[in-house]
Amino acid sequence: MTTEDATTVTGMNPQIVVRRLAAAEGYLELGLPNYALAELNSVTDPGPFAPIAELFRGEALQAQEKYADAIAPLNRAAQLFPAPFNQRALLALSNCYRQDGQTQLADETAAAVEMPPDVTPDTKLIIAPIFHITKNAGGRITKGDN
């Protein structure tokens, strides 16, 4: 049995952790939070990828409408990501506070989000994926590919 075949990732193998996180993000994009959580639960030590794992865990719980449960991982993600990269976590955290009836915390968290000046409150935001998987991801990038 290889390390990759193991159901649970023990120790920090960056390639496997990134693969699991990319799978979790893909499941979230497909609206399958249960599968995303299964991928996240298989990673016992995300190492330096902990902020991403926390963000995805919070988003999966939010998608399951478990807002109170989503608050802790989203809060950790918002703290672990440096500003302005924590905006996605802060937006999700604000929504979870609001859905959980904690309006004051929701407003305070939303106020911490640094939006560009041209974004109005009614603007629909599209959050870009963290991992971008391409069909031909196996090749190396050479100097001429830049």
Roles of regions detected by a PLM:
Residues 13-45:
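Alpha-helical segment of the N-proximal tetratricopeptide repeat
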Residues 18, 52, 86-88, 122:
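Start-of-helix register in tetratricopeptide repeats
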Residues 22, 56, 92, 126-129:
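"A position-specific structural signal for the A-helix of alpha-solenoid helical repeats
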Residues 74-80, 91-121:
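TPR/TPR-like (Sel1-like) alpha-helical repeat modules
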